[in-house]
Amino acid sequence: MYDTLKIIHSLLRWLILLAGFYAVLRSLGGITGKKAYTGADGKAGLFYMIFFDLQLLVGLALYFFASPLVGIHDMAGAMKDPIIRFYTVEHETLAIIAFVLVHIGRAKTKKGTDAQRHKTALLFFGIALLLVLALVPWPFRAVGAMQGWF
């Protein structure tokens, strides 16, 4: 079960990154090109949010039911080890903040002028995307050295 959930979690990461970059680029293009906020812009944010929702569910299942890491049972010990601390505290905290930002951004883009909606999307989706880039255990980081790209 752990391996299957971990693979799904990893694949969803790539979908989140693609949807996030797409939503950010659409909002940036809308601002610079002074374009109307269209249904396609709304759908870009919607898919970004949906992939985040799925990722949160899989992540929670991994964290509470399937993960072999025991940091949650020994927080004092987990805080002393940077890798266990990352997976026990930092990864989840940043993920939840990014999740909330995407949901707030999606809700706020439903009202306002086209320019305001694009700016709101860029702000909330952009910050969430930066957090995702920071919370992923990339293979070039110590926390992801054994993970690989997928």
Placement of each model-derived feature along the sequence:
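Membrane-embedded alpha-helical bundles that constitute the cytochrome b-like, heme-associated redox core
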Residues: M1-F150
